[in-house]
Amino acid sequence: TELGHTLRGYTDDALTPEGWQQMQLAVLEKLQQPVQWQAIYSSTLIRCSHFARQLSQQLKLPLILNSDLKEMNFGQWEGCSTEEIYQREPELLTSFWEKPSFYTPPEAEPLHEFQYRIQRAFQLIHQQMLENNWRQVLVICHGGVIKLMKCLASDQSSDHLLKIPAELGQL
C-alpha cells in the first residue's frame, strides 16, 4: 500500500501500482479457466474494495462489501513501523508479538474482538451462500484476516496468528 511497511489496520490507504499488479496477477490464472465464483466479498477498505469493484464489474458478479472484513485496528500503532514501535515500547511490542491475546496495543482492537468480528463476517457469508445457492465465492481481505482464518481452520490458538504466513496479493 501507499504507507509501505507499517501497521495499517483500519488506515484506509490505497494499493500502490505494484500492489495492484500483484492482485491482478493473482486472479489472472483463475481467469484463464471458467470462473467458478458466484459473488465477490470484500473489506470496505479501499486497498481491497477498489480492486474488488473492478473485478466484479469485469466478471459481472455481485459485489458485497462488508466492514467486518477489515483488518485489525492497531490503535496508536496505526501507520507506524515495527521499528518505530520497538524504539518507543519494546516490551509491549515483544509481548504483543508473542501473545497477542494477552497484550493489546494502546487504543487498539483486542484480539478476541477481532476474532469475533471476523467469525461474524464469515458466518454471514456462509448464510448468504446458502440463501443464494452459491457454491464458491471470492473473499478479498487483509493479511490479519487470512492469518486468523488459517488459525481457526487448523485449530490453532489465535496467539499463533502473528507467526502464520499470509502472502499478500495471493489466492
Please annotate each region the language model reported.
Residues G143-K147:
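GST superfamily/GST-like fold recognition
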Residues Q32-Q36, I125-Q136:
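Glycine-rich phosphate-binding loop signature in dinucleotide/nucleotide-binding domains
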Residues Q156-L171:
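Domain-level recognition of soluble alpha/beta enzyme cores
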Residues Q54, L148-L152:
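Active-site signature of alpha/beta-hydrolase-fold catalytic machinery across serine-
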Residues S42-S43, Y116, I140-C141:
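Short beta-strand scaffold positions
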Residues T1-L61:
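Active-site-proximal alpha-helix that buttresses catalytic centers in soluble enzyme cores
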Residues L59-Q119:
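Phosphate-handling substructures
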